[in-house]
Amino acid sequence: MKNKILFIDRDGTLIDEPINTFQVDSINKLVFKKYVISSLRKLVELDYKLIMITNQDGLGTESFPLQDFSTAHLFMLSVFRSEGVIFDDILICPHFLDDDCVCRKPKIKMIEPWLDKIDLKKSYVIGDRDTDMQLSNNLKIKGIKYKEDICNWLHITKYIIKHNRYAEIIRRTKETKVSIKVWLDLEETSKIDTGVKFFDHMLEQLSVHSGICMNISVQGDLDIDDHHTIEDTGIVLGEALLQALGKKNGLSRFGFYLPMDESRSNCIMDISNRPYLNFKAKFNHKMAGDLSTNMVEHFFYSLCYSMKITLHLYAEGKNDHHCIESLFKVFGRTLRQAIKIEGNMLPTSKGIL
């Protein structure tokens, strides 16, 4: 199985590199880079494997005794481990540049056991030197150059998350043009414009309560009615969510939510690859704002079948606005549960989902 792997430099990237000796040979010289621990913990939670790869010039010689290195290095690892950050491998080249060894970065000799396991599209080399970027080129994966002010661990983590569970789909028909981007793990303000203001408001509720950032742009034949606009938005949004989920390893898969307020609603979801919708809600009027109320069920039907989920969605209430809003909110809350990553196992006994 291919893995999302971060190949991370040590000195200058995980910890400060002493400007005089360039050697972290005592605990007193050990200074962690800002935000590095919390950032790596977040990336581990998103199922990234961590591999430390470092050149340590002359390690084991009189100029850099192994014992001095090990004391600080092992203490560093213990701090990371105490915060839930465990490296899957640690690769160290002890040679000088002039030794012309086979293992020194940016050569890939040390990484050979991992070469067949790298997800090339979602793996990165992270480091502060040009040699780290050369390593990324040699591995044919993206490189991220660490810089304290403009590309620190907050920036790096945000970038990786943004490109992790992400999808973009554009769909054109004679009736509509729908463009949707989704980021499952990025909580930022969404940009939504379907031409139907009430529908925009509902999609914003879905985004907020699911924790999913969505950029949705729709041009449709609203001069006729809102049918194609709502239907095609549901289709494309479902396709985008399905694509962003990827292989589904570690996926929670199931979700349920039962909020109680002026309008009552509940939702049960299974990301099952078996589309089915059981929808129960009645509305008192044909329109809620500029949205046809009969299109609410059709939206969830379209999304359900394109995302390939099993969905039970119920609501009742006297006010159509509140009732519809509760449906989108409860769906978002349930979706938030179901897309959460918990471990690395595929959540099915069938071996495929």
From Swiss-Prot:
Pathways per UniProt: Amino-acid biosynthesis; L-histidine biosynthesis; L-histidine from 5-phospho-alpha-D-ribose 1-diphosphate: step 6/9; Amino-acid biosynthesis; L-histidine biosynthesis; L-histidine from 5-phospho-alpha-D-ribose 1-diphosphate: step 8/9
Cofactor: Mg(2+); Zn(2+)
Region ranges (Imidazoleglycerol-phosphate dehydratase): 165-353
Region (Histidinol-phosphatase): 1-164
Catalytic activity reported: D-erythro-1-(imidazol-4-yl)glycerol 3-phosphate = 3-(imidazol-4-yl)-2-oxopropyl phosphate + H2O; L-histidinol phosphate + H2O = L-histidinol + phosphate
PANTHER family linked: IMIDAZOLEGLYCEROL-PHOSPHATE DEHYDRATASE, IMIDAZOLEGLYCEROL-PHOSPHATE DEHYDRATASE HIS7
Protein name: Histidine biosynthesis bifunctional protein HisB
Naturally occurring in which organism (per UniProt): Buchnera aphidicola subsp. Acyrthosiphon pisum (strain APS)
